């Protein structure tokens, strides 16, 4: 397994007056799925209680196999989530830094996890994560830009046009030209329409307007 790229303290997003900077190993779309499934499980707990689950149950919920390699993959993902450092600046006035999205204990014999969620990070996802959203993401496998857009747009009503250059930068796309990226963007948005994640979109020369219902977050890059 190749190592995930390590990020220096870098501005990942600046939307609606909130700047998000990231330091550490780059999180990916699979990490987002693990995190949001844990957040979903937390909704079923009383406030303040830890989240518990078996590796087998988590992998099954994510639609993955349950063999040794998948268990190792989950360990890697949990370690990335536990090691991430995120700094949030609100309207240029207040900044808050947080080490890790979560803390966890794992029983190596039973492969059962006990997870303590970081309160400030959990608040960023306070709108929750529905089963419908999870099913939508399952349909977007092998479509990294569509997956990233699904996570990004879930936290934005996007009633105003978004600059295509901004989406290009925030998504981490490897498209070398704006023309190439606009083509990829159109295909990704068409995929979101097809699964019912957004109602519609309009792309003009340098911006795109999207009609949808907001939900989750934009902290994960697409890696494309």
Regions found by a protein language model. Give the residues of each.
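Charged, alpha-helix-forming regions
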Residues: 1-224
């Amino acid at each position: 397994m190749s190592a995930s790229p390590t990020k220096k303290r870098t501005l990942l997003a600046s939307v609606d007056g909130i700047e998000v900077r990231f330091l550490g190993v780059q999180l990916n779309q699979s990490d987002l799925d693990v995190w949001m499934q844990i957040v979903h499980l937390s909704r079923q707990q009383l406030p303040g209680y830890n989240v518990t689950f078996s590796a087998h149950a988590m992998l099954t919920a994510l639609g993955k196999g349950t063999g040794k390699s998948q268990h190792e993959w989950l360990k890697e993902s949990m370690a990335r989530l536990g090691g991430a450092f995120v700094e949030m600046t609100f309207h240029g006035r207040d900044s808050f830094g947080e080490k890790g999205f979560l803390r966890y204990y794992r029983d190596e014999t039973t492969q059962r996890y006990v997870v303590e969620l970081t309160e400030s990070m959990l608040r960023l996802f306070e709108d929750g994560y529905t089963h419908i959203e999870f099913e939508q993401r399952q349909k977007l496998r092998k479509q990294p830009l569509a997956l990233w857009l699904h996570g990004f747009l879930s936290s934005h009503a996007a009633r105003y046009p978004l600059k295509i250059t901004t989406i290009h930068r925030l998504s981490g796309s490897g498209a070398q030209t704006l023309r190439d990226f606009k083509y990829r963007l159109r295909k990704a948005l068409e995929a979101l329409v097809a699964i019912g994640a957004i109602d519609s979109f309009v792309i003009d020369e340098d911006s795109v307007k999207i009609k949808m219902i907001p939900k989750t977050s934009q902290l994960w890059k697409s890696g494309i």
